[in-house]
Amino acid sequence: VLPYVPVIFAGVEGRTALPAADQLPQKTYLAYGSSITHGSLSLIQPDCYVFRNAQALGVDYLNLGFAGNALMEEEMANYLVSRRDWDFASVEMGINTAERVKEFPLEVFEERIDRFTAVLARDPRPVFATSFFGYLDEDTDRTDKMRRIVRRYAAERLIFTDGLQLLDDETLISADGTHPDARGQEQIAARWSRIMAETLANRTAR
């Protein structure tokens, strides 16, 4: 349920001890994205891919999932890199703009992705990026074009994994046709956390 309801600390009884410094996570992972990142339809928050990624990597996490409003604004990118409380990050790009692209040209979407990724790329910390996860789409031509735009900029500037590599199974998508179900969230986490672990280990070994 945490961190979405008020929690009142009433105290602790019995023999207890605060965790030692070496028992706490040494790094923090920040995740930006849509309601999928936020954890919608993952049953409970510890089932969302962000929590599972952090668990697999043994790190703390900051979930900046914005339901319906992950619009990749340049201002948001500047805010993310201004924060000094994370060591590596992930950005999920595209799904919240899929309908909006009907109202403005793809060139506007491309300019937004260009500026967003350019800001993130200037920060030395590792940023993992992905495009649309698999979902039941009525306009595959438009979505394919948007996927290619995300790939063009993110693959050059960030640590990119196509969303279809993380989730491309209709049986793991919920009844709304957009959000992964609990098993879908698990698959995203299993695949992406493995990529993250290998990439971060290689960077540490340099």
What does each of the following model-derived ranges do?
Residues 31, 61-63, 160:
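Conserved beta-strand scaffold positions in the cores of enzyme catalytic domains, especially
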Residues 50-62, 152:
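Short helix-loop-beta junction
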